[in-house]
Amino acid sequence: MNDKQLVAIEAAKLATNGMLIGLGTGSTANYFIEALAERQTKEGLNIQTVASSTISAIKAQNCGLALVAISQINQLDLYVDGADEITPKLSLLKGRGQDLVMEKLLATAAKQFVVVADKSKLVSRIGEKFVIPIEVMPNAWQMVKQQLEKHGGNGDIRLNASQDNVAISAQGNYILDMT
């Protein structure tokens, strides 16, 4: 069992009966979903979940977790997600998986936001290992990019996996990858 699995299992212990739980996106979030589903099965937990991405929703359904649409909630009891980078002051870089808006909405709606990560995510400053993703409306990406450049940012629009078109977020937006 790796460190990500161990921290995900610990995070799943925070779930209690009747909770509405937000599910993050990524490899560590997947371990959390599995651990949460295992607790539900073994302990008979009555919980509902809200997924931050289509891939997490599919994972949750495959694991037997009940899903609620974000449009049906006002607040979450708990939101658990991973991070791409974490500084000593607990600043986080998230969103390399293109689900920035949903992750931010769920984190903001949660009474408790728990980030599960192993030591490989620790950095001295945000942007040390990865570019900083910024989700923008398609009709405003150039304006946003210019404004960020005025403040010292540098970067460009993210391309899809085939490198032949613009990458589109789950919400239909573009992503600027900035340094």
Where are these regions (language model features)?
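N-terminal active-site beta-alpha-beta segment that forms phosphate/nucleotide-binding
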Residues: 1-82
